[in-house]
């Protein structure tokens, strides 16, 4: 299988615990649109994709600084709604359409996962779709606190009469069907607040999707998932981990550390404002102290109206390397705890905004003692080159999830597309370059 989303069956089903919102069914098949909405700690990103016979064409991208979110969780409804509206408006301008529904990502340390299994008797001695549905229902029958809900039930394998390793059991003969699954749960209130913010921004939520699951569809290929790979999505407020082996997700967790913690350390260490620290990190940052010229000097803005100061770049790099290594060490501990670190024969794939930090791949290879690559969304048509950046991994992956789940909606042109693409692309180019 080429790079792209998981199949609908691999993504799994929601449970009765997640009925706080209803999925919006697809509307028509002509010129279909899918929209992914990534609600991050540092940015809100909207990506619009058009379903084609070849796959997906990117037709619109919008980003806006995130306000009202912390660690992937909504902490201010009004600010979050405003960020969503701005990102959606920019994507609409580029795509030349009106956006009415989205696939929204969810993240945060409130997300938890576990492995489960279910067993049923096969009524007709041949596995049917009804049997598969029943065994998944049995597997997701778990005790949950009242304030949590199931987001995903992800099949790992099916077993028919002790024959294991089956991924597509329909049509097979047998009397006993077993399913081993990976279940992802989240705080109900956190999911409800995401849905509420989208609705206040005049958007219907077609589904809420774990962000690392979405990212995996955009940046991992089938060979990596088969051999064993860890996807590590390091964003502004959290670092998300998803481990795949034998083409199924085996472990997932979220670490409450990300790029903002690096920025905070820079702010304290260099005695400058957070905004200044973020600019310095992006302009001069490096995750390996040995990789920078020890004689190089940078200018640092001061607080309280004082004059800017000059400091050795090596001081900045030492601060960044220390915090980045701490984040990677914690992630390695999570991989050891999962029991799969020795099975990652395809290594580690880093994505998310922090993966753009120079030197982080080399540092990660030292920490994990295995090959590491930077994952970017690939195999998109249209404006696909625009999203070939780790910051778009989640939003692009949400498009693939939506495509696999028949989430296309008919496109309504609201303005001339070529002109709007040109104007928005110029804004995007100025912002990121």
Task: Please state what every model-predicted region is.
Residues 2-43, 47-231, 248-250, 259, ...:
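Nucleotide/phosphate-binding catalytic cleft detector across ATP-hydrolyzing
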Residues 234, 323-332:
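A general structural motif
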Residues 221-223, 353-367:
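Short glycine/threonine-rich loop-to-helix capping motif typified by GTGT followed
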Residues 104-109, 346-356:
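Glycine-rich beta-strand-to-loop/alpha-helix junction loops that act as flexible
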Residues 240-242:
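A structural feature that tracks compact, well-ordered secondary-structure segments
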Residues 245:
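A cytosolic small-molecule/anion-sensing beta-strand core signal
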Residues 331, 350, 398:
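Hydrophobic, well-ordered secondary-structure elements that form the walls
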